[in-house]
Amino acid sequence: MSKEKRLIEKEDLIPANIYSESRKQIRKDLVEFKKNRRIALGPYATFYFESFETMVAQVQEMLHIEKGGDEQLKDELIAYNPLVPNGKELVATLMFEIDNPISRGAFLGKVGGIEEKIFMKVDNEEVKALPEADVDRTSEEGKASSVQFIHFKLNDDQINKFKSDNINIELGIDHKEYSHATKLTEANIKSLLADFI
């Protein structure tokens, strides 16, 4: 198993036929696992904190849907391995979820550059989010992407604080058109602790 290496390899996946038979239960278990890793922020933004487990599930599901075998697997590993937390960071998929396409387009047109305004506070010490490299975030026209991949890189002191009892962790966005913050619950923090070495 490659969890300790923080890298998904072919050996971490179950065979396609077994996945297909077990898929319903696997997905049900994943929903439960992800429950405390989902954090809503304001009316439209939701952070889904990724992990080795969520990325294995994503690769497995893509292979199940597209049935591309080993050739596809190479591409999926290139795409999803950078989103496996490396032991000193938290990684999240941030989604702006607005059902109406016209409203969504108008909102995203107002929040260009929002990926530069995301932060986490660990005991009032701010950690700026780093957008995933080589992924489109804000277009040349200033329109934000509805899906953002972000990293929060923490130093050893911040990680130790994260692990301490009664720690105050805050997640926020400070954009002039979308400014919201929320405190992480004890259940959120406990789930995210597994991402650190």
Regions found by a protein language model. Name each.
Residues S2-T46, E50-E89, E97-I197:
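Long, contiguous binding/interaction regions
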